[in-house]
Amino acid sequence: MAKMTTEEAFVKVLQKHGIQHAFGIIGSAFMPISDLFPKAGITFWDVAHESNGGIMADGYTRSTGKIAMCIAQNGPGITGLVTPIKTAFWNHTPMLLVTPQAANKTIGQGGFQEVEQMNLFKDMVCYQEEVRDPSRMAEVLNRVIEKAIRGSAPAQINVPRDYWTQVIDIELPPIVRLERQGGGAEAIDKAAKLLSNAKFPVILSGAGVVIGGAIEETKKLAEKLDSPVCSGYQHNDSFPGSHPLAVGPLGYNGSKAVWN
């Protein structure tokens, strides 16, 4: 057990998960924690509008494979994240969504800029949880990040603003990573037979390739089969467009080569 403030516990969990970048706008509901970012090696990217922060977090993760955090002031600031969070949800992008809330003692009584932030994002995240006890700050944050990574989608932690600067005595929770398993031997054998007998195989790459971390394997398969590769809607990131076998995206805005 170790004594620390709730914001110190929050930052220590971010560090354990390797989160190095946060995007958005920090208001009074999150200021106590932002002072700890520089020493913790976390870069905060201040933006002109909250939507920009969410879009940048989505793009950062899709281009690097590393999870990021987006943040805004409770109430009107948080509502600015609706579009990018829903976009990240459909893009299958793991993301930590931090939503500071009105003070605990004022929730439900028209607290400062109070908005029902859990209901707002309930169909845009794979998991959401509100901190109901300051001593569980690290536990809840750790669980939310794990859910975002496992679900490959945004996950939300809702934190009452008066839960910062609380002194707690806790042990930091362990990180539990689940290994992604490959296909079974029988399924792989059937797939190999289908591909070997195909007259003109075409590969459609999409979210599964990204989530499975299989971009390099997809390149090798395409080269072995000499097969053109088209990318699913919103997932040009699943196959490098500079590759000679890449023919572009599928969908209403797809390339002519794909349709042909």
Protein language model features and the residues they cover:
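N-terminal alpha/beta PP-like core and its mobile active-site loop of ThDP/TPP-dependent enzymes
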Residues: 1-260
